[in-house]
Amino acid sequence: MATRAQPGPLSQAGSAGVAALATVGVASGPGPGRPGPLQDETLGVASVPSQWRAVQGIRWETKSCQTASIATASASAQARNHVDAQVQTEAPVPVSVQPPSQYDIPRLAAFLRRVEAMVIRELNKNWQSHAFDGFEVNWTEQQQMVSCLYTLGYPPAQAQGLHVTSISWNSTGSVVACAYGRLDHGDWSTLKSFVCAWNLDRRDLRPQQPSAVVEVPSAVLCLAFHPTQPSHVAGGLYSGEVLVWDLSRLEDPLLWRTGLTDDTHTDPVSQVVWLPEPGHSHRFQVLSVATDGKVLLWQGIGVGQLQLTEGFALVMQQLPRSTKLKKHPRGETEVGATAVAFSSFDPRLFILGTEGGFPLKCSLAAGEAALTRMPSSVPLRAPAQFTFSPHGGPIYSVSCSPFHRNLFLSAGTDGHVHLYSMLQAPPLTSLQLSLKYLFAVRWSPVRPLVFAAASGKGDVQLFDLQKSSQKPTVLIKQTQDESPVYCLEFNSQQTQLLAAGDAQGTVKVWQLSTEFTEQGPREAEDLDCLAAEVAA
């Protein structure tokens, strides 16, 4: 509602009237000089909408004043792990057997008597038949050729002109180790040398970077891995010492050493062999032979010391006169030992190669005292039992057959390999393989009629006597410049592998073809016939 005032003339006393109006409100009535009364009027409502809101629009925003949720975690301080294992096998299912009463014993006996003669006759025919000779089931891929898998070397040793003098495979067949030294003329007693090993099963194998390297103060001439400890290896030095290393210890690999005492060899050590202690198949001793004529047995005691437990001496006057022997070129009474091989059938029986060229059959059980004045902390005994016909020069290597108790091979400077029977002095056969020296010969661990020889002309010769007894089946060229091959070893665990070391300081690992790794039919019988025919 709006109030509207009617206009009218104001009197001179207008100001007083206004005051009266303000005080009283409405005049009692119109009159001259008085204003008209105030009246109420109802007018229409006018609305003006907001244009600003339409332009700006309405915006909504959602805000949160609550903090993020609190992260919690639960942990058990005394949790228990439970593992269930069942060790009891399932109860065996009883085999259903018919009661004995259901068998007709008399009729069964009559049937067996009736067919016995016919079955025996057929079995005899099958036994004498050769229909399936040569039949074999081949579960692996056939390897047709001999190939070189690895060419290994140690550049610092090769830079010094050192030769690979010995090779050995460890008990697992995965690691091959070599000794560096010199086998030619000269005084190498003060020359620093090395023992190196490569793990062929490593994916990151580096042929010129051995897995283990041991620096040795004197030239190493021979090496042999422990039969059961894969990282233990024994070595013989030019100085006459025998040492044992643990190749898994990179900082200080030396385990034991003989030291330079009265018991130590006075000449270079030719070969070392691990032997089980009598009565302790899990404990081993180290046997060493040298050109001073002594055969010594060492046992590791305490920390770092090899102690002499048994000793033998080869004296010319005590050798059995089984054959005519040449006089020792220097007129000495001691006979220098150059190689040794133990029988696979008698752990006390061994063959020695000598500087005089004649092999000796010896025994660790010998009790006769040696007629020598060489100093020793233990009594020295004379081990020789039998003397065989000699080579034309010193023997460098001998190897006993793993398949026949009486057969062994020898190789020497005359370039011949002799096959001997322990039952007679003359060799069963003599093969001239080279016009130069033969430094090593080894019998195959899987083929009774196969052996390998290393020559001074840089080759490795593989012989299969079942095919030919006069020429090698395979000739492997180890060195292109005909540098001598000084050593070789079959791998008894991975029988397809053969390692050979040469004068260039290189070790080559050869993969043999299938014909050298799988035994043929009647091969063992043929070896028996070879020994029996000539020895008869």
From Swiss-Prot:
<dbReference type="InterPro" id="IPR036322">
    <property type="entry name" value="WD40_repeat_dom_sf"/>
</dbReference>
<dbReference type="GO" id="GO:0042073">
    <property type="term" value="P:intraciliary transport"/>
</dbReference>
<dbReference type="GO" id="GO:0045504">
    <property type="term" value="F:dynein heavy chain binding"/>
</dbReference>
<feature type="repeat" description="WD 3">
    <location>
        <begin position="390"/>
        <end position="430"/>
    </location>
</feature>
<keyword id="KW-0206">Cytoskeleton</keyword>
<dbReference type="GO" id="GO:0005930">
    <property type="term" value="C:axoneme"/>
</dbReference>
<dbReference type="GO" id="GO:0097542">
    <property type="term" value="C:ciliary tip"/>
</dbReference>
<dbReference type="GO" id="GO:0005829">
    <property type="term" value="C:cytosol"/>
</dbReference>
<keyword id="KW-0225">Disease variant</keyword>
<dbReference type="GO" id="GO:0060271">
    <property type="term" value="P:cilium assembly"/>
</dbReference>
<dbReference type="GO" id="GO:0005737">
    <property type="term" value="C:cytoplasm"/>
</dbReference>
<dbReference type="GO" id="GO:0045503">
    <property type="term" value="F:dynein light chain binding"/>
</dbReference>
<keyword id="KW-0966">Cell projection</keyword>
<dbReference type="InterPro" id="IPR050687">
    <property type="entry name" value="Dynein_IC"/>
</dbReference>
<feature type="region of interest" description="DYNLL2 binding">
    <location>
        <begin position="80"/>
        <end position="93"/>
    </location>
</feature>
<comment type="function">
    <text>Acts as a negative regulator of the Toll-like and IL-1R receptor signaling pathways. Inhibits the MAP3K7-induced NF-kappa-B activation pathway. Inhibits MAP3K7 phosphorylation at 'Thr-184' and 'Thr-187' upon Il-1 beta stimulation.</text>
</comment>
<dbReference type="GO" id="GO:0031965">
    <property type="term" value="C:nuclear membrane"/>
</dbReference>
<dbReference type="InterPro" id="IPR001680">
    <property type="entry name" value="WD40_rpt"/>
</dbReference>
<dbReference type="InterPro" id="IPR015943">
    <property type="entry name" value="WD40/YVTN_repeat-like_dom_sf"/>
</dbReference>
<keyword id="KW-0677">Repeat</keyword>
<dbReference type="GO" id="GO:0005868">
    <property type="term" value="C:cytoplasmic dynein complex"/>
</dbReference>
<protein>
    <recommendedName>
        <fullName>Cytoplasmic dynein 2 intermediate chain 2</fullName>
    </recommendedName>
</protein>
<feature type="repeat" description="WD 5">
    <location>
        <begin position="480"/>
        <end position="520"/>
    </location>
</feature>
<dbReference type="GO" id="GO:0035721">
    <property type="term" value="P:intraciliary retrograde transport"/>
</dbReference>
<dbReference type="GO" id="GO:0097014">
    <property type="term" value="C:ciliary plasm"/>
</dbReference>
<comment type="similarity">
    <text>Belongs to the dynein light intermediate chain family.</text>
</comment>
<dbReference type="Pfam" id="PF00400">
    <property type="entry name" value="WD40"/>
</dbReference>
<comment type="subunit">
    <text>The cytoplasmic dynein 2 complex consists of two catalytic heavy chains (HCs) and a number of non-catalytic subunits presented by intermediate chains (ICs), light intermediate chains (LICs) and light chains (LCs). Among them, a heavy chain (DYNC2H1), two intermediate chains (DYNC2I2 and DYNC2I1), a light intermediate chain (DYNC2LI1), and a light chain (DYNLT2B) are unique to the cytoplasmic dynein complex 2, but a subset of the light chains are also shared by dynein-1 and dynein-2 complexes.</text>
</comment>
<dbReference type="GO" id="GO:0005814">
    <property type="term" value="C:centriole"/>
</dbReference>
<dbReference type="GO" id="GO:0005813">
    <property type="term" value="C:centrosome"/>
</dbReference>
<dbReference type="GO" id="GO:0005654">
    <property type="term" value="C:nucleoplasm"/>
</dbReference>
<dbReference type="GO" id="GO:0036064">
    <property type="term" value="C:ciliary basal body"/>
</dbReference>
<feature type="repeat" description="WD 4">
    <location>
        <begin position="433"/>
        <end position="473"/>
    </location>
</feature>
<feature type="repeat" description="WD 1">
    <location>
        <begin position="215"/>
        <end position="255"/>
    </location>
</feature>
<keyword id="KW-1186">Ciliopathy</keyword>
<keyword id="KW-0853">WD repeat</keyword>
<feature type="region of interest" description="DYNLRB1 binding">
    <location>
        <begin position="106"/>
        <end position="131"/>
    </location>
</feature>
<dbReference type="GO" id="GO:0005730">
    <property type="term" value="C:nucleolus"/>
</dbReference>
<keyword id="KW-0963">Cytoplasm</keyword>
<dbReference type="GO" id="GO:0016604">
    <property type="term" value="C:nuclear body"/>
</dbReference>
<feature type="repeat" description="WD 2">
    <location>
        <begin position="264"/>
        <end position="308"/>
    </location>
</feature>
<dbReference type="GO" id="GO:0005929">
    <property type="term" value="C:cilium"/>
</dbReference>
